[in-house]
């Protein structure tokens, strides 16, 4: 049976990259939803020209943008079977979406994460603080939750009904870790697929600044320790 698939792309000032991301998404996808997170450049214009549905979320925060996309889908008559989350900076390879959704379709896996493994990462595509933060977070998840996750990457696919069951709430930097921790707690079946990763177009709004890195790190650790006591 053909699956109904939607992609949600949070985007903040990604005018130079957003069309490339959209154009590389496989045609199997039914709808591409770009959520402009208060962008001040031509992100919205370029996304519209490339064929995406464009939503506006004035409240800054990765989670706010993702939740906006989910609310839009919830209000539609026809619900998808699979939701894919993808960043708008062209650091991921959108064509690998097929590799992420295949285990869901063929093996009935609930949640598939694109893992940015060292062997497939372009040099410099992840900052030292990102690499260390990923290692620390996934190590703590292994110790506290017996998790086998190796990454917190944003490129991920999940069954729509499972996503709704997670009752996602984080508004900012903790969105990805929240999803993984809740999936573990609810005993979802999950899988990591190694994905390629390249240097993004433009400057990162999180890992590209000291403030963003610190805030993201604090939020991630907060989620881990919050769930370790539940």
What are the language-model segments listed below?
Residues 58-60, 64-71, 94-173, 200-211, ...:
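Acceptor/aglycone-binding surface of glycosyltransferases and processive sugar-polymer synthases
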Residues 14-17, 39, 93:
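Donor nucleotide-sugar binding loop of glycosyltransferases
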Residues 12-28:
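Short, well-formed alpha-helical segments that are part of the catalytic scaffolds
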Residues 44-76:
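Conserved donor nucleotide-binding strand/loop of the catalytic core
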Residues 79-91:
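Short beta-strand-to-loop acidic/aromatic patch adjacent to the donor-nucleotide binding site
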Residues 1-2, 16, 146, 168-230:
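Hydrophobic helical membrane-anchoring modules
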Residues 36-45:
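A conserved acidic beta->alpha catalytic loop
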